[in-house]
């Protein structure tokens, strides 16, 4: 197998006009980004390296797009890409976000649920400032961050109270490996969780990135309310985000049968960064 493991830095002399990026996490979402690059949809960028577990998955992705396969995140950081796209996990973000940012590398995040931890969020922002880098939160399976952030700014400027909540309907089988599982969910629709976004990520670390991302643009993980409904025979997820102040109400409701939209949101974000016209 042609396994191009990278151990040294990458020379940017090859193409100074293009921004470079790497991918951390070579599963379903990471490969959507890699495939989009291969299709020519990220023409302003050069993909220089990937990493992920199992290593065989990273090797497969690297061969597909003809870039370096890094044995671990340290080797990818050593290549000094302009951006690292995270499509790995909440645990990866907790362990690596700060040092990536301190290295001066911009970080594009999918596993935003990690930032329900206010202390980690604060350290990541401080690391970004120290390293002169940016944290880019991909919209993932939802969207509307622009209007949600605008509404929150209005609330703060006019000293108005704001209410924000995220209501999700999803298939029952997604709750099988969680503390709320019971056999009744196979046949009966049920509300399995109601609480704050911070509480939700503690119980469902792999299912509520949407809630945490939305909360960061509105009232925060401690006060944004999350309601999760388990629905028998349901395919996909339906996320309804509502934020309201006196005189303004924003509702964003998005259904997706698979998580593919989260991977494509990264592609759209990278294109937006490189475009002469930015949509917020």
Where are these predicted regions, by residue range?
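Active-site-lining helix/loop region of Rossmann-like oxidoreductase modules
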Residues: 24, 32, 136, 141-280
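A short helix->loop->beta-strand "cap" motif at the edges of active sites that frequently abuts
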Residues: 67, 103-105, 130-133
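General beta-strand structural signal in soluble alpha/beta enzymes
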Residues: 86, 109, 135-139
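Rossmann-fold NAD(P)-binding glycine/threonine-rich loop
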Residues: 112-133
């Amino acid at each position: 197998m042609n396994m191009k493991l990278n151990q040294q830095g990458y020379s940017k002399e090859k193409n100074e006009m293009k921004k470079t990026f790497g991918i951390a996490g070579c599963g379903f979402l990471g490969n959507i980004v890699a495939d989009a690059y291969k299709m020519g949809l990220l023409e302003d960028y050069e993909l220089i390296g990937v990493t992920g577990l199992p290593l065989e998955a990273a090797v497969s992705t690297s061969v597909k797009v003809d870039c370096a396969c890094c044995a671990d995140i340290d080797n990818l950081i050593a290549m000094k890409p302009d951006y690292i796209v995270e499509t790995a996990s909440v645990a990866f973000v907790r362990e690596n976000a700060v040092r990536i940012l301190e290295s001066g590398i911009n970080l594009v995040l999918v596993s935003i649920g990690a930032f329900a931890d206010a202390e980690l969020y604060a350290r990541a922002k401080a690391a970004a400032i120290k390293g002169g880098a940016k944290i880019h939160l991909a919209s993932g399976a939802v969207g509307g961050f622009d209007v949600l952030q605008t509404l929150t700014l209005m609330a703060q400027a006019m000293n108005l109270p704001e209410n924000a909540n995220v209501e999700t309907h999803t298939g029952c089988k997604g709750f099988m490996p969680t503390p709320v599982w019971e056999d009744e969910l196979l046949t009966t629709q049920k509300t399995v969780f109601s609480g704050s976004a911070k509480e939700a990520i503690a119980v469902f670390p792999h299912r509520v990135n949407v809630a945490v991302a939305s909360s960061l643009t509105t009232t925060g993980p401690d006060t944004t309310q999350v309601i999760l409904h388990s629905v028998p025979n349901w395919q996909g997820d339906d996320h309804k985000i509502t934020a309201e102040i006196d005189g303004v109400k924003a509702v964003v409701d998005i259904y997706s049968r698979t998580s593919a939209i989260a991977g494509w949101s990264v592609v759209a974000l990278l294109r937006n960064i490189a475009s002469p016209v930015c949509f917020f």
